[in-house]
């Protein structure tokens, strides 16, 4: 089967042609604004002007005619609406003229599937980093699930916006990478990891302020990369332990960055897992990836009429079935974690846990020390305040800043994730009460997921090391957002589970509606907004 794929979600229009065993041809054209960033209408004009030529050249390279094509795939979303419409119109035209079937493809799905094809990865956790996208994705129960993502802007957009303010034309990423290689001074930038999610707007604001005050652009670029990339690798490693996967795959334009690739490779080596880096020519948006995803969808039984191919600028990967993937058996990581090592000890005859903050070689050493110490101190402080607020949580027995460790009460029971996977839901009412108590006390957890909640006869909240006292509504909303997404990531009937928990939360916290409205606002900020 010969498949033609058309990609056109943002700045690049591309045509790729494949069959089951060969990549036959690829032709692309990128819109490059003379000044500023991407202007959606101008990008669409560029695509409409060159798309015929791009398709013709790809057919010439493949040494076939348009009538030899058996299937047409196109990027349905997410993306810039004007660009998406140009691409979809071309795909529909080819389908109607040739009488061949057409399939609309989710753009991130294409990145994953071409990465799996060219690297040999089987069931990886994918770090997908580009201009508008920053996501950590894994396959769970028949679909790819978003385990973590940006809460504001994509990392590529952040880098490009800084570059633009510094007088560097689009795309600014490659030049920032070169400048960073000459930097030596690590500047203080916000390190914003919230559970499995990240935020980059604070880094952009601080970096622009450094630029205004005359700091060397080499040092600013170096600091942007060291800080932002460390955030990405941290959440990627956390996703491994949550999902039980033992492979990593990188894709997207930012995945071309050598420093990021080195950091991911180092993390994978320390964790004892395999890392796969998508070939450089297929990291950027391209038609081959759309053709590959369309091929897999078609072979799994997906069919679409032309009327069903409307574009969707907010199309999420977790809306798409992916039955061609068989989830690999879960890797047992034991008591290892992304940030700490857990040891079972005895404290004056009491069963206890000693949590040691471990160094991460992929991070800048100064940044690593700062993060480890701040989180350890924060966990100690917030655990005490949770107890004062009546929230079930471990009692802290000892705090040793010299060994970067905390010793605390051992809580018997199982993680909430394990209980939900076995169908237990009788604890959800109490969970809502505990979260309400925490938020009433002005405390945000910062990493409230199904793996930081222990269930026995009661519900216990653990590991608030990323938390915040004197929390604002936005901080509390991130707690609910993170918990909802971690429940959805299990692939269960998440609506019922979340609904039970939120009903109890609402009944016990007078600001719950404000928090939940902010959760909705956070979700609306995703991708190209």
Curated annotation (Swiss-Prot):
Residue ranges of every copy of the Protein kinase domain listed in the record: 329-529
CC per GO annotation: cytoplasm; EKC/KEOPS complex
GO biological process: tRNA threonylcarbamoyladenosine modification
Cofactor, free-text remark: Binds 1 Fe(2+) ion per subunit.
Binding locations of ATP: 335-342, 355
InterPro entries from the UniProt entry: ATPase_NBD, Bud32, Gcp-like_dom, KAE1/TsaD, Kae1_archaea_euk, Kinase-like_dom_sf, RIO_dom, tRNA_threonyl_synthase/kinase
Keyword Transit peptide among record annotations: no
Binding site for L-threonylcarbamoyladenylate: 128-132, 160, 173, 177, 257
One Pfam family hit: RIO1
Catalysis: reaction(s): L-seryl-[protein] + ATP = O-phospho-L-seryl-[protein] + ADP + H(+); L-threonyl-[protein] + ATP = O-phospho-L-threonyl-[protein] + ADP + H(+); L-threonylcarbamoyladenylate + adenosine(37) in tRNA = N(6)-L-threonylcarbamoyladenosine(37) in tRNA + AMP + H(+)
Keywords associated with the record: Acyltransferase, ATP-binding, Cytoplasm, Iron, Kinase, Metal-binding, Multifunctional enzyme, Nucleotide-binding, Serine/threonine-protein kinase, Transferase, tRNA processing
Names of the cofactor(s): Fe(2+)
Recorded GO MF terms: ATP binding; iron ion binding; metalloendopeptidase activity; N(6)-L-threonylcarbamoyladenine synthase activity; protein serine kinase activity; protein serine/threonine kinase activity; protein serine/threonine/tyrosine kinase activity; zinc ion binding
Classification via SUPFAM superfamilies: Actin-like ATPase domain, Protein kinase-like (PK-like)
Superkingdom of origin: Archaea
Binding site residues for Fe cation: 107, 111, 128, 285
Subcellular location: Cytoplasm
Catalytic residues, chain numbering: 447 (proton acceptor)
EC number in record: 2.3.1.234, 2.7.11.1
Assembly mode: Component of the KEOPS complex that consists of Kae1, Bud32, Cgi121 and Pcc1; the whole complex dimerizes.
UniProt similarity note: In the N-terminal section; belongs to the KAE1 / TsaD family. In the C-terminal section; belongs to the protein kinase superfamily. Tyr protein kinase family. BUD32 subfamily.
Function: Required for the formation of a threonylcarbamoyl group on adenosine at position 37 (t(6)A37) in tRNAs that read codons beginning with adenine. Is a component of the KEOPS complex that is probably involved in the transfer of the threonylcarbamoyl moiety of threonylcarbamoyl-AMP (TC-AMP) to the N6 group of A37. The Kae1 domain likely plays a direct catalytic role in this reaction. The Bud32 domain probably displays kinase activity that regulates Kae1 function.
Name recorded for this polypeptide: Probable bifunctional tRNA threonylcarbamoyladenosine biosynthesis protein
Species of the source: Thermoplasma acidophilum (strain ATCC 25905 / DSM 1728 / JCM 9062 / NBRC 15155 / AMRC-C165)
């Amino acid at each position: 089967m010969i498949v033609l794929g058309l990609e056109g979600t943002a700045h690049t229009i591309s045509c790729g042609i494949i069959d089951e065993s060969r990549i036959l041809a690829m032709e692309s054209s990128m819109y490059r604004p003379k000044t500023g960033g991407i202007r959606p209408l101008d990008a669409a004009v560029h695509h409409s002007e060159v798309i015929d030529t791009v398709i013709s050249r790809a057919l010439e390279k493949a040494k076939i005619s348009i009538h030899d094509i058996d299937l047409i795939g196109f990027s349905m979303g997410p993306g810039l609406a004007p660009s998406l419409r140009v691409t979809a119109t071309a795909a529909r035209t080819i389908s109607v003229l040739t009488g061949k079937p057409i399939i609309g493809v989710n753009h991130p799905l294409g990145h994953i599937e071409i990465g799996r094809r060219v690297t040999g990865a089987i069931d990886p956790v994918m770090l997908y980093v580009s201009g508008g996208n920053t996501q950590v994705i894994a396959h769970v129960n028949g679909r790819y699930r978003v385990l973590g993502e940006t809460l504001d802007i994509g990392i590529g957009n952040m880098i490009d916006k800084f570059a633009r303010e510094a007088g560097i034309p689009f795309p600014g990423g490659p030049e920032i990478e070169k400048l960073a290689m000459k930097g030596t001074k690590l500047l203080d930038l916000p390190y914003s990891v919230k559970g499995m999610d990240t935020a980059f707007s604070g880094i952009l604001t601080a970096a622009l302020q450094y630029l205004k005050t005359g700091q060397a652009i080499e040092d600013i670029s170096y600091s942007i990369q060291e800080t932002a990339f460390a955030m990405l690798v941290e959440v990627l490693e956390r996703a491994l332990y949550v999902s039980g996967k033992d492979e990593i795959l990188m894709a997207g334009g930012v995945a071309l960055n050598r420093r990021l690739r080195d950091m991911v490779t180092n993390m994978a080596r320390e964790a004892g897992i395999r890392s796969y880096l998508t070939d450089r020519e297929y990291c950027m948006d391209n038609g081959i990836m759309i053709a590959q995803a369309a091929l897999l969808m078609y072979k799994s039984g997906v069919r679409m009429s032309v009327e069903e191919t409307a574009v969707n600028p907010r199309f999420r990967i977790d809306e798409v079935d992916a039955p061609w993937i068989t989830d690999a058996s879960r890797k047992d990581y034991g008591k290892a974690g992304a940030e700490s090592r857990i040891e079972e000890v005895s404290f004056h005859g009491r069963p206890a846990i000693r949590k040691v903050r471990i160094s991460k070689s992929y991070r800048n050493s100064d940044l690593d020390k700062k993060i480890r110490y701040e989180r350890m101190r924060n966990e100690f402080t917030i655990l005490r305040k949770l107890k004062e607020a009546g929230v079930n949580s471990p009692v802290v027995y000892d705090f040793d800043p010299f060994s970067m460790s905390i010793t605390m009460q051992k809580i018997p029971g199982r993680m909430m994730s394990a209980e939900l996977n076995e169908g237990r839901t009788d604890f959800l009412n109490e969970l809502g009460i505990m979260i309400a108590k925490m938020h009433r006390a002005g405390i945000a957890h910062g990493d409230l997921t199904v793996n930081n909640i222990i269930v026995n006869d009661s519900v216990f909240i653990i590991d608030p090391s990323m938390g915040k006292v004197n929390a604002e509504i936005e901080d509390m909303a991130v707690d609910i957002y993170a918990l909802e997404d971690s429940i959805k990531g299990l692939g269960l009937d998440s609506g019922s589970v979340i609904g039970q928990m939120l009903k109890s939360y609402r009944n016990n916290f007078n600001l719950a509606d404000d928090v939940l409205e902010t959760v909705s606002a956070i979700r609306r900020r995703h991708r190209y907004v």
